[in-house]
Amino acid sequence: ILIARHGKVIYNKSFGYHTYRNSQKTTNDDLYDIASLTKITSTVPSLMVLYDQNKFDIGKTMGYYLPALKTSNKDSLTILDVLTHQAGLLPWIPFYYKLIETLDTSETLFSTKYSDIYSLKLTKNSFANRNIVLKDSLFSSVYSKEFPVLVARDLYLRADYLDTINQTIINSPLSEKKEYKYSDLGYYMFHQL
């Protein structure tokens, strides 16, 4: 937990473990992906308002609300199954792979150990591959109508890449087992409601 005010950290303490096995304690240098949290906290309140206004029924299908899904395998997924992670959606799609030039197939993007190749320190135990090259056609260092999506300081993504993300989700396979498997892909789609 980190609390900061006016740029000054007033509290910073780690609690718990990385897994339920309690074998590795968390540290202040651990890196977390909070994108999933952001998708949920920005989407669920909107869905709740729509539900309270009787404009949204969790028993209806994704295709009912999103016509783009009508011809896909996502058409008949119920909102309830998507919200409870029982729709069979993939747990994760690495969208960033399409944003980078091809790496040597023996190299990964990240490593837990520093080396000549993994020399870009992200956290205490996380290093990025220095050979990563972003595709010029997808990024700009200047904001514009064509590049409005802020990714990082002085780095903007093409507006139409969001369509690529949506199409990748639409075309993704479903698991045949309808059991709990965390996936935030439905939250990407809920933003279109």
Regions found by a protein language model. Give the residues of each.
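Active-site-proximal loop and beta-strand segments within enzyme catalytic domains
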Residues: 20-182
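Short hydrophobic alpha-helix segments
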Residues: 13-15
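Well-ordered alpha-helical segments within folded domains of soluble proteins
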Residues: 42-44, 186-191
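Gly/Ser/Thr-rich helix-start
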Residues: 17, 89, 187
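Short, intrinsically disordered, charge-balanced linker/junction segments flanking boundaries
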Residues: 173-175, 189-193
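Short hydrophobic alpha-helical segments used for membrane anchoring or interfacial signaling
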Residues: 1-6
